[in-house]
Amino acid sequence: MDFTNLKNTDPELLDMIKKEEERQEYNIELIASENFTSLSVMEAMGSLLTNKYAEGYPHKRYYGGCEFVDEVEDLARERLKKLFAAEHANVQPHSGSQANMAVYMSVLQTGDTILGMDLSHGGHLTHGSPVNFSGKLYNFISYGVDKETETIDYEKLKKIALENRPKMIVSGASAYPRIIDFQKIREICDEIDAYMMVDMAHIAGLVATGLHPSPVPYADFVTTTTHKTLRGPRGGAILCKEKYAKAVDKAIFPGIQGGPLMHTIAAKAVCFGEALREDYKEYMQQVVKNTKVLGEELKNYGFRLISGGTDNHLLLIDLTNKNITGKDAEKLLDSVGITVNKNTIPFETLSPFITSGIRIGTPAVTTRGFKEEEMKKIAYFMNYSIEHREENLSQIKEQIKEICKKYPLYQNA
């Protein structure tokens, strides 16, 4: 990208950006929630739309001069509705967490009971963690996975729901490698007359391309981020049934946000447009293929995969049998140029700052052009680094750098 002005006005900051640019260029990015946006997304993000205040919604703003940003937001909303066949869309949430907060606030009262997936079983902070606003403002009860299969125990979920009769059931996860049965959860919600919310932040790209069943026909509310598998700018969005549209929109503005970030909404419109193209479907198909191959190769090296494998874009790995913690594995792999994150596993025995596992995913490396052969090499690099962690691993670091050079991040930047 062109940094001519920044070079002249703030070389100190530019130096930091350049160092991060180099890190992204020469590291294998396996954090499941990260991806690389297109240059078009970044151009929209860096546009003069950042100058415009636009409190309110298109054609009902509290400021003048909004006729063109109205067009931008309308375009983003229409593309998002088309992408997921939804009745209503709100593209103003600054993040997935704020999208979730707005849904809770739209139909619930403080102190209401909500059923959400346990964080250590693959849920998310905003699904009821006691350190998060969700756990502080609402009475969250957790469900999780079966100890044997390590997949969601729907019978137990139903039992907990019948015993506690929550006002809402939240599904979706941040570290769950299997298909989620939204129809089954809808049936449980209907039995207890509860709202159904799905946080599809991680799997939105899979849903958009038919690689994971869509929650939209079943859920009252669906939230997502725009920067994971959707490959857009950092931000959030909400889809809902038309009957909840006013309540959701009011919860975002004036409920928890003021002016929307119009440059980000423009970038969201770009990413939704990209996701509607055929080449995006091919990309997501390759993500799933890559994840399966990476998982099988790691199993061949003796790594234990939670639930035995994957149906989506991520793998959750139990490192107990490798005699290394998630924290140490993250640091070790980072030293050779592979970026992962430590992650709790179901029925975790260690602290969330240490963890028994790591979470990895293939969306970012697939964006670069990595395919099955590269997945086999990544599995080899990971295994070799962990098995020979007391040795000099400079040759692995060099091999990783060479692979990254073959697949430059932004060839035309």
From Swiss-Prot:
Residues annotated as site: Plays an important role in substrate specificity: H227
Compartment(s) where it occurs, according to its Swiss-Prot or TrEMBL record: Cytoplasm
Assigned keywords, A-Z: Amino-acid biosynthesis, Cytoplasm, One-carbon metabolism, Pyridoxal phosphate, Transferase
A GO term, aspect molecular function: glycine hydroxymethyltransferase activity
Residues that hold (6S)-5,6,7,8-tetrahydrofolate according to the record: L119, G123, H124, L125, S351, P352, F353
Keyword Amino-acid biosynthesis: yes
Recorded GO CC terms: cytosol
InterPro entries on file: PyrdxlP-dep_Trfase, PyrdxlP-dep_Trfase_major, PyrdxlP-dep_Trfase_small, Ser_HO-MeTrfase, Ser_HO-MeTrfase-like, Ser_HO-MeTrfase_PLP_BS, SHMT-like_dom
Pathway assigned to this chain's UniProt record: One-carbon metabolism; tetrahydrofolate interconversion; Amino-acid biosynthesis; glycine biosynthesis; glycine from L-serine: step 1/1
Cofactor(s) the protein requires to work: pyridoxal 5'-phosphate
Matches recorded under CDD domains: SHMT
Assembly mode: Homodimer.
Protein family per UniProt: Belongs to the SHMT family.
Protein name: Serine hydroxymethyltransferase
Originating species: Clostridium botulinum (strain Kyoto / Type A2)
